[in-house]
Amino acid sequence: MSIMKSKIAKTLVVVVVAIAIFTLVLLMLWEGPLGTLTEENLTELNGEVPFRFKDSGSNEEGKDVTLSKFFVCLNKVLRSADDSLSSYLCCGETSEEEGESKKGKYVKNAITEARNMMFRVKDSKDVILEILKKGDKNRNELAETVSNAFSAVETSEGSDQESEGADEQGKIEKLNTALAELYIWIWLKGIPEEDKRTLQFRKTYKENQSVKNLLDGLDEENREVAESTILVKVGKKEDSMHVIEHILTSIFQANGYMEKGSIKQAYLSAKASVAAAGGSLGKKVSEVSDNEGKGLIDSLFGMIGWRNNSNNNSSVSKKKEEQGVNS
């Protein structure tokens, strides 16, 4: 009889331990609306590095966009972003071309990385604050890092060597991290200039099926927030836009710096080609003006709007203007 009681007691202990472990796992896997952030974290962040958005004041009573509502909606949107949406946010249209498909994968991974940084790591508030301060210290650093990282990925693609393949993967991971940091910076603080592509995106994004699917997939409360209006600093003014518009436009703008990375490589090739062909009155490559290559590439790719240059047809001796994200 005592042996039977002993077996029952041991069985009960095992069951209790199993239930405790299972409950602990569930608690670890469960993610609140704000993830590892708290409302206090948001208030502290906004106090240290003021965000570029606020409630518009034109939403219905009781439906104003608080910091908590915005971040919860952002978390849901990032979690719901699929490959199709990532591709659209990369090039502004659905593209089956291999190059755009690869960029779409980088964007999808970067969106996931940004969500991890903001809502899933233990010290998410500190991670966000570090990114915001980095952007404040040097407004161009985050954008230039994306451009350089993408250029590095481009030059390493197509390698068959195992060691070089591992190096390529490392460069892709750096690109994903750089993009994720730029997303966070533009969502919360950075103010990039709006070019024609951005304005066109803002006018047409609602018509895209991937965006429609995203909104349809949100719960009622977060869809309501996504379609509420906020005031966002754009250039030297504040512009009224929907929350979802701000979130998606910021990703689209950040992705544009991958294009700049591509142009940078093409531009270098153009300079070499001009010199090799005896162009520029026989100048050496080192003597070819920056604006000569830039004008050629801008014409080929239609990317004049990405550059903060109002005199593309001016003298070739004019200094090349710096580009980057304004704060």
From Swiss-Prot:
> Hey, what's the signal peptide range on this chain?
none
Coiled-coil regions, chain positions: 162-227
Q: Where is the composition biased (Acidic residues)?
A: 157-167
- Cell compartment(s), UniProt: Membrane
Q: What's the protein's topology in the membrane?
A: Single-pass membrane protein
* The keyword DNA repair is annotated on this UniProt entry: no
Q: Which residues cross the membrane?
A: 12-32
Instruction: Give me the Gene Ontology terms describing cellular component.
Output: membrane
Region Disordered, as annotated, extends over 149-170
Keywords attached to this Swiss-Prot or TrEMBL record, sorted alphabetically, are: Coiled coil, Membrane, Transmembrane, Transmembrane helix
| Record protein name field | Uncharacterized membrane protein ECU05_0140
